[in-house]
Design a protein with these regions (language model features):
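Conserved inter-motif catalytic segment of the P-loop NTP-binding fold
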Residues: 51-129, 281
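The Walker A/P-loop phosphate-binding site
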Residues: 1-72
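Terminal-proximal interaction/regulatory segments of ATP-powered molecular machines
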Residues: 258-289
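Short glycine-/polar-rich loops that comprise or flank the Walker A/P-loop
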Residues: 23, 49-52, 83-84, 150-151, ...
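P-loop NTPase motor core
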Residues: 25, 98-176, 180
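Conserved P-loop NTPase
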Residues: 1-2, 112-117, 185-255
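Short, hinge-like loop/turn segments at secondary-structure boundaries
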Residues: 71-74, 170-175, 199-200
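Conserved nucleotide-binding/hydrolysis micro-motifs of P-loop NTPases
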Residues: 59-63, 92-97, 123-126, 159-164, ...
Length: 289
């Protein structure tokens, strides 16, 4: 699966190289966690490579989003807007059902690009527009499907409560998204600590750790990925090889199946695996009867 760079420093290395192309990602966090900054970074990364960008705001107006980007040190956003490479859709204050079912599909149908980055910031007002969960799911699902037709999508979602992803506002977007990223921060005695965690990422190997991150002017979100090191294994560890040698009487087809099954593992995986138990399970899967 083709990967695209996220634009978030340090995130690609813990997300198997980046977002899957034409996928949907939901970034969840409370106010001040850096969600809009994250969305802007994602869009700007594509703009720097000549990709078109669409920023759909469902809450703040265009001027506010641009002002925040310029204050972050990204004044080139103004040039991209003037050149038409970046398109801004201000849907704040609109009737969301009509916007999602009529206006958005019409816009997408007229859009000629096929490798676009789309940011939707935030999804929360859509959920607030109706208390019917079936209607919420239908609206969010339709919106993600339409935007994904022309590119890769990143949405933000406001989180309320203790930050455990248990609120009703998070359930539907988390279910529908291909990738979910959680931003958390704590303020105590004047100090702020922030953590990023990848909750799920379909068809991707990713870190399951909580990674510290910072928000820095000129850079945006900077994720500390040092704790996560994943490299594809270039050799079978000695304990695995010893067990395989003991199984040399197995049919060649099964031996080949076992070897192939091990190819996708990383050096990190072998740290917590018991060699004999692993091999026995793989052999059992490919043995007849």
């Amino acid at each position: 699966m083709r990967k695209i760079r996220t634009g978030i420093y340090g995130l690609n290395s813990i997300l198997d190289g980046g977002f899957n192309e034409n996928s949907t990602t939901v970034v969840i966090g409370s106010s001040g966690a850096g969600k809009t900054t994250c969305a802007t970074q994602f869009i700007r990364r594509g703009l720097l490579e000549g990709q078109e960008g669409i920023f759909v705001s469902l809450d703040e107006n265009k001027e506010q989003i641009i002002r925040e980007a310029v204050e972050m040190g990204w004044s080139d956003i103004l040039d991209y807007l003037e050149d038409g490479l970046l398109v801004f859709i201000d849907a704040s204050g609109r009737e969301f059902s009509n916007f999602i079912r009529k206006e958005l599909p019409a816009f997408v149908s007229d859009w000629r690009g096929a490798n676009t980055r789309i940011a939707v910031d935030p999804l929360t007002p859509v959920l607030w527009s109706t208390k019917d969960q079936y209607e919420q799911r239908d609206l969010i699902g339709f919106m993600l499907k339409e935007t994904r037709r022309v590119g890769t999508v990143l949405c933000t979602l406001e989180e309320h409560g203790p930050g455990e992803l248990t609120g009703p506002e998070t359930i539907i977007p988390m279910y529908l998204a291909d990738c979910v990223i959680h931003l958390r921060y704590k303020a105590a005695e004047g100090n702020v600590t922030r953590f990023l965690k990848i909750i799920k990422a379909r068809s991707s190997r990713h870190s399951e750790l909580s990674h510290p991150y910072r928000i820095m002017k000129g850079l945006g979100l900077l994720v500390d990925s040092a704790a996560y090191k994943r490299e594809k294994t270039t050799r079978i560890p000695s304990q695995i090889k010893d067990v395989l040698d003991q199984k040399s009487t197995l049919p060649k087809s099964i031996q080949e199946s076992v070897q192939k099954a091990l190819e996708g593992l990383s050096d990190e995986d072998f740290k917590t695996l018991k060699a004999e138990h692993l091999i026995e399970n793989i052999i059992a899967e490919y043995s007849e009867g």
